[in-house]
Structure formats: structure tokens, C-alpha cells
Amino acid sequence: MNRKNIIGIPIKNLKEPMSRLDSTLDKNQRISLQIGLIKNLAECFRSKDNDIFLISNDSEIEKLANQLEINFFNAKSVGLNKEVIEFSKNFKNYQGWMICHSDLPYVTKYFAKTIIQEIEGSEILIAKSKDSGTPFIAGSISFDEFRFGVKSFDKHSKYLKENKFEYKQIY
């Protein structure tokens, strides 16, 4: 373990990214936007203390990781939750971990630094989106019960409460 934190950014592929915007942006615009958001995440979290990984089983995502000079986790599993659970086996090698959606538009270097500091003092940090999704979840303890999908924040928080994890909701 050379670095303190591991950050995973799951992304299926670039074939139909951000499909919820298909009535506003054409496919090439959505691909450019998705790549731009991933680049921003990589730059904001890039530091001597963080190992950043794109999580996927798509060769185009591996090429993108190489272009961005970040790590690639080649998931053997299929499906977001299974891929992230597989990736989470690496958490034990780090003091802190974070799973972050690949399309977060509001991340800045200040935000990234603040989140990393918050991880150090928390078992679990979790964010809730307007649609009750989980744009990011992070922590300093072993965790592998990811429940992304519809109303994932509600599923995560229910699991955390039932299993008596201390967690802090931010944002």
C-alpha cells in the first residue's frame, strides 16, 4: 500500500452514456461530456495519497484510463453492484475508500480534498441525490454491500442502520 485511499469510478462503457440526456444532446456530445466529467474527477482526486481506478470490463474504458494516467480495474463480474463488490476486495489495502459516479458535474479540487478529509474521521460517508440515488459512498472500514440502482440511497441507509454502521450523510 503506497497510497492512503482508493477511489473507484464505475463506468459500463461509452456506447450510450448519459442516456437521460438523449433528448438534449446527441450521442457524440454525451460521449464528450462523459469523458470530460471523468477527466475532471481524475484531476480533482489526483494526489500522492489517492489511487484512482476506472472500474469496467470494457476495453475502451481501459484505454481512457491509460490516457488519463489512472488505474484500470478489469472487472470479471457483470453489473454495477457486482463489479463494485469485486473491486471492494482491494479496500483492505488502504485506509480509506470511495466509490464515485462517473458523471458527477459538481466536483472541484476543494470538494475532493474535503471528502478525503471526511473519510479519515468517518466509518461511512454517503451522499443522496435528488432522485434518492447514491452519487458517492466512502469510508474507512471494510464494506462490500453495495446497492446501486433505483433509490439506492434508501437501500444503502437501510442496510447501514440495520447492521449498526455509523454513517454520515453529506450533501
Please state what every model-predicted region is:
Residues 21-29:
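Short glycine-enriched, charge-decorated loop/helix-capping segments at active-site entrances
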Residues 107-132:
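Conserved donor-nucleotide/metal-binding helix-loop-beta segment in metal-dependent transferases, i.e.
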Residues 66-98:
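Short phosphate-binding loop-to-helix
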Residues 1-21:
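N-terminal nucleotide-binding beta1-loop-alpha1 segment
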Residues 49-71:
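Acidic donor-binding segment of Leloir-type glycosyltransferases
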Residues 141-171:
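Active-site oxyanion/phosphate-handling segment shared across diverse enzymes
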Residues 32-50:
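A short, N-terminal amphipathic alpha-helix
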Residues 101-105:
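The conserved acidic donor/metal-binding loop of glycosyltransferases
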